[in-house]
Amino acid sequence: MSRAIAADKREDDSQFDSTLRPKSLDDYIGQEKIKGNLRLFIEAARGRGEALDHVLLYGPPGLGKTTLANIVACEMGVNLKSTSGPVIERPGDLAAILTNLEPHDVLFIDEIHRLSHVVEEILYPAMEDFQLDIIIGQGPSARSIKLDLPRFTLVGATTRAGLLSSPLRDRFGVISRMDFYTHDELATIITRSSRILGMEIEPRGADELSRRSRGTPRIANRLLRRVRDFAQVRADGVITRQVVKETLALLEIDEMGFDHMDRMILLTIIDKFSGGPVGLDTIAAAISEESDTIEDVYEPYMIQNGFLNRTPRGRVATLAAYEHFGRSVPAAPQAALL
C-alpha cells in the first residue's frame, strides 16, 4: 500500500494535479523569492524578445517544480515540452526533442540528475551555443556536423542537486532552491483547491490539514481528496477540523504529519539504539527498508522539523522526538540532544 503522505508523483495524481495547478505567477502560492526573481527575469526576456535563461529548480519532491515550469512557459507565451531524465536513454532521443522545438520554447526535464553522461555531452552545446553536434558514419569515415537550434529555455528539476555534474549545473543561468511551505501557505493552497473542487471547508479544517501535510502541496492536495471522501459520506460534505482529524486518524497520520513508517524509524532509533548515534544501514536493516529510501524520502522532513540529526557517527533522535512520543530522555545522550 502506497503512503498517503509520500511526496513522489503517482499516476492517479496527474488529472487531479492538472485541475488544481495554477497557471500564472500571481496564482502561485508560496516560494516568494523564486517567484519574484522569475517575474523579473521573464519580464526582461520578453521585453528584449529573447528566450529566458536556463532555469534549474531543486528541492524535495512535491513542492511545485513542474508547476513552475508550466508557469514559465505560460508567462513567456510559448510552448512547453516535457520529458524526464530516465526517458532520454540515447543521444538520438534528446536530438529528436531539441530539433522539434520552436523559438523560445520551454523544454522541461524532470529528474535531470538521471541523464546519462553521454546524453549530457549532447546537451552542453545545445544549452550554451544552441547547436547540436551530430556524428555521421562510423570508424575512420565518421564526421561531425553542427545543426543550429532555435533559442530555447531549459527548465531542469531535481530532488538531488548534488548528483548534477558541475559542467551541467554551470550552464544554468537561474538556480533556485524550493523550500517547504509554511502552515499558512498550505492552508491557503488547501482553501484554493477546495474552492476549485466545489468543496466547503472551514478555516480550522484547512489549518488542521495544513499542519499534517509535511510542508508539501502535493501531499496537502492528496490528503484533501481523502478528507473529501470522508466528508461526503459521514459529514454532509462539509470539511471541519473534526472531519480532518477523524480522516487522518483512519490513515494513521498524526498531528506532525508522521505516518507508520516515520514513527517506526524514529522509535527504532529511540527504543532499540538508545536514541543514537546509529548508522543508516543499521536502521535500514532493523526496519527492512532501503537505505536510500530512508535518506531521500523519510529523513528530510524529520530533519527539517528538528526530530532527527545527521552526525558523522550516525543518526541521532532529538529532544523533540523524545517529547513527541512521550519517551524519557536517557541521561547519557541528553546533553547532545539539547
UniProtKB/Swiss-Prot annotation:
- UniProt superkingdom: Bacteria
The record's Pfam families line, in alphabetical order, gives:
AAA_lid_4, RuvB_C, RuvB_N
Per UniProt, which keywords does this protein have?
A: ATP-binding, Cytoplasm, DNA damage, DNA recombination, DNA repair, DNA-binding, Hydrolase, Nucleotide-binding
Its cellular-component GO annotations read: cytoplasm; Holliday junction resolvase complex
Chain positions recorded as Mg(2+) binding sites: T66
Subcellular location, record wording: Cytoplasm
Region of interest: Large ATPase domain (RuvB-L)? 1-181
A Gene Ontology biological process annotation? DNA repair
Question: Which annotated residues bind ATP?
Answer: L20, R21, G62, K65, T66, T67, E128, D129, F130, R171, Y181, R218
User: InterPro entries annotated for this entry?
Assistant: AAA+_ATPase, AAA_lid_4, DNA_helicase_Holl-junc_RuvB, P-loop_NTPase, RuvB-like_N, RuvB_C, WH-like_DNA-bd_sf, WH_DNA-bd_sf
Q: What is known of its domains?
A: Has 3 domains, the large (RuvB-L) and small ATPase (RuvB-S) domains and the C-terminal head (RuvB-H) domain. The head domain binds DNA, while the ATPase domains jointly bind ATP, ADP or are empty depending on the state of the subunit in the translocation cycle. During a single DNA translocation step the structure of each domain remains the same, but their relative positions change.
Q: Which SUPFAM superfamilies match?
A: P-loop containing nucleoside triphosphate hydrolases, Winged helix' DNA-binding domain
Output the NCBIfam families linked to this UniProt entry.
PRK00080.1 (NF000868), ruvB (TIGR00635)
Task: Determine if Cell membrane is one of this entry's keywords.
Answer: no
Subunit note: Homohexamer. Forms an RuvA(8)-RuvB(12)-Holliday junction (HJ) complex. HJ DNA is sandwiched between 2 RuvA tetramers; dsDNA enters through RuvA and exits via RuvB. An RuvB hexamer assembles on each DNA strand where it exits the tetramer. Each RuvB hexamer is contacted by two RuvA subunits (via domain III) on 2 adjacent RuvB subunits; this complex drives branch migration. In the full resolvosome a probable DNA-RuvA(4)-RuvB(12)-RuvC(2) complex forms which resolves the HJ.
This enzyme's EC code(s): 3.6.4.-
The molecule here is called Holliday junction branch migration complex subunit RuvB
In the record, what terms sit under GO molecular function?
Answer: ATP binding; ATP hydrolysis activity; four-way junction DNA binding; four-way junction helicase activity
Q: Looking at the record, which segments are called Head domain (RuvB-H)?
A: 255-338
Q: Give the matching CDD domains.
A: AAA (cd00009)
Span list, region Small ATPAse domain (RuvB-S): 182-252
- UniProt function note: The RuvA-RuvB-RuvC complex processes Holliday junction (HJ) DNA during genetic recombination and DNA repair, while the RuvA-RuvB complex plays an important role in the rescue of blocked DNA replication forks via replication fork reversal (RFR). RuvA specifically binds to HJ cruciform DNA, conferring on it an open structure. The RuvB hexamer acts as an ATP-dependent pump, pulling dsDNA into and through the RuvAB complex. RuvB forms 2 homohexamers on either side of HJ DNA bound by 1 or 2 RuvA tetramers; 4 subunits per hexamer contact DNA at a time.
Organism field: Pelobacter propionicus (strain DSM 2379 / NBRC 103807 / OttBd1)
